[in-house]
C-alpha cells in the first residue's frame, strides 16, 4: 500500500500538468480581451443577415419539435459513446458486461418506440 508521501510523489506530475493546463487556457481566454482595441460601431452591433437588414426579430420562437430532435440526437450520440468502448472491450468484460449493455440498449429502444408511437418524430 502506498504511503501518503509516495502517493503525493506519484500524482505530483499530474497535478502540475493540470495546473499548467488551467493557467495556459485561462491566459489564452483572457489575453485577447486585454490586448485588443475596442472600437464600437453601430453597424457592428446590429445583427447581420446575408447583407440585408434583418427581416424580423432574431429571438423568434422555435417549434418544440426542433428541441425533441436535438434531444434525440444527444441521446443516441451518448449511446454510441457508450457502445464503442463496450464493443472494443467485449472479450474482457464477460457475460455481465454483455447483458448490462443489452439492458441499456433495450431501455433506449423502448424509449425510441414510445416516442415514435406518440408522434414526437412526425412533422
Curated annotation (Swiss-Prot):
Pfam families: Oxidored_q4
InterPro entries with a match to the protein in the record: NAD(P)H_OxRDtase_bac/plastid, NADH_UbQ/plastoQ_OxRdtase_su3, NDAH_ubi_oxred_su3_sf
Annotated coiled-coil segments of the chain: none
Gene Ontology CC: NADH dehydrogenase complex; plasma membrane
Recorded catalytic activity of this chain's protein: a quinone + NADH + 5 H(+)(in) = a quinol + NAD(+) + 4 H(+)(out)
Membrane topology of the entry: Multi-pass membrane protein
GO molecular function, one term: NADH dehydrogenase (ubiquinone) activity
Compartment(s) where it occurs, according to its Swiss-Prot or TrEMBL record: Cell inner membrane
Top EC class of this enzyme: translocase
Alphabetical UniProt keywords: Cell inner membrane, Cell membrane, Membrane, NAD, Quinone, Translocase, Transmembrane, Transmembrane helix, Transport, Ubiquinone
Quaternary organization: NDH-1 is composed of 14 different subunits. Subunits NuoA, H, J, K, L, M, N constitute the membrane sector of the complex.
HAMAP family (UniProt xref): NDH1_NuoA
PANTHER family: NADH-UBIQUINONE OXIDOREDUCTASE CHAIN 3
Family of this protein: Belongs to the complex I subunit 3 family.
Job of this protein: NDH-1 shuttles electrons from NADH, via FMN and iron-sulfur (Fe-S) centers, to quinones in the respiratory chain. The immediate electron acceptor for the enzyme in this species is believed to be ubiquinone. Couples the redox reaction to proton translocation (for every two electrons transferred, four hydrogen ions are translocated across the cytoplasmic membrane), and thus conserves the redox energy in a proton gradient.
UniProt-recorded name of the protein: NADH-quinone oxidoreductase subunit A
